[in-house]
Amino acid sequence: MADKLWRTCRLMINGLAHKVQYNQETIDSLFLPFLRRMTNLQQKKGQRFLVYLAAPPGTGKSTLALLLEKLSQMGDGIEQIQAVGLDGFHYHSDYIASHSVERDGKKIPMAMVKGCPETFDVDRLKEKLQAVKTEDVRWPVYDRRRHDVVEEVVTVRRNIILLEGNWLLLRDAGWEDIYSFADYTLFITAHAGDLKDRLIQRKIRGGMTQREAESFYERSDKLNVERVLRQSWLAQETWRLLPDGDYVLQADAPKPVQMVNRSSLWKKPDVRRSEDDIMIDRIQQQLAAYHAQGKDDYAEGYSEGMAAARRDILRNLYNSGRMSSKELLSTFELAPEDLADILMRDKA
């Protein structure tokens, strides 16, 4: 850390005071440019702009979100952002104390795994995200001193909202719709081993003993870290947390593939159609004409060619690691046996 110029900040997060350090060069070369890009994107949209900051536990996302909020208030030409958290959508402590979750066929008290996706009220989160896109709303917070949710605390009123949380990009059932509310997504990745001590120390600051903190890490935090790293949708931008607490842009991180709903696109009167789009439209018209004339051999050949191209695309997505078999099944609405046949042909 000695080779870097560190700036010390004192921030209040979820009812607890935090003294944190950030590399000045990172502030200048990563954080401020990010805020300027978000400003430009919001101005182009002309409406409220919702940014997700998703990351595993222990990566410092809550303090980072608040720092970005503070920096936006000081930066010239930067739209002020408002940082809010996902933790306010935990179920209340009395609910968690009286309910359980199922793990590997066994029921486990929610209190033992607090922080996992099952301990959040996802339906309430969806309602709030829908409302915040177009109106000012009151936002709940999680108070770590009370270990409970406090409702309707913060009024969300800025044009750029930065929402931070572990599960914002989770691909699991019940959470998949959350992704669609975001205008921009940022993910912080890290080596799971680097987060262990950070998470244990956080629990100790919250009142646990060393043994209690280590036990909670093994049964809850560790699993949550692995789940976020393995089961999150790809983000539009990825930063990496270094062992010294600094952040760097991970420029080689894979980006999400933009899927186009072509049938919906055609219905928009203001769409500028490319030459490729016009060509596809003409081919479809020609196919209809051939079919009307009884010339189905051409149509059959065309269909076979398109099917072969589709198989190649699916194999490339799978072999490159850009999409898992589960993602291919859900995205392209394939039957498991059809996907298996496509992938087996690649090995043949």
What are these regions (language model features)?
Residues 146-202:
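ATP-dependent NMP and nucleoside kinases share a basic, alpha-helical "lid"
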Residues 2-37, 41-44, 201-205, 219-265, ...:
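NTP-dependent small-molecule kinase module
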Residues 64:
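Hydrophobic positions on the alpha1 helix immediately C-terminal to the Walker A/P-loop
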Residues 61:
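Conserved lysine of the Walker
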Residues 82, 91-143:
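Conserved nucleotide-sensing/catalytic segment adjacent to the nucleotide-binding pocket
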Residues 55:
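The Walker A (P-loop) glycine that initiates the GxxxxGKT/S ATP-binding motif of P-loop NTPases
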